[in-house]
Amino acid sequence: MKKFFLIFLLYFLSQLSSLSNERDNKLNQLFIELKVNQSNDAFIVEQEIWKLWSTHPTDMNLTARLEEGAQFVRNQQLSKAIEIFTEVIKLDQNWAEAWNKRATVFYMMGKFKQSQEDIDKVLELEARHFGALAGQGLVNIQLKNYEKAILSYQQVKEIYPSMQSPEIMIRRIEELIKQQTI
């Protein structure tokens, strides 16, 4: 019986690894497409990336909890959203999107340092997370770290060249810097 259980466990773990590799390969391909596609096509690729990020690789219950938290955000129940995202993070500390969702809510609550801490974790797990990088830009604007904000938006442009908001934000930040020196 022990032998059967061990064989089953090894098979199960190999399937999880296979799913993870498949997901990583799909993301890698989408990021290549994101770099070369223009506006409309790139937007479709972006949506596919968000779909993968927002879907837990192995646990649909965590995906459902993340969506529940997102619903609380849409309803402006930010404290409840934080609770749910924190619960999801405790259950899987390696799911970048759970950290990203909580970082977003911390930003919305004006808790910029906590937001940045979560963004750091997102980027540790998924360095190409253009949403977290854009959020990092917003956090740095609030903290008046304008040069860091510009760097964040430049990184977004490297990952997602056809996204227009980074250019707009960089121009706005440059205006803020000019106003400081006047």
Please describe what each predicted stretch is.
Residues 28-38, 141-165, 171, 175:
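TPR/TPR-like (Sel1-like) alpha-helical repeat modules
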Residues 34-35, 50-53, 89, 123, ...:
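A conserved position within tetratricopeptide repeats
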Residues 7-15:
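Bacterial N-terminal signal peptides
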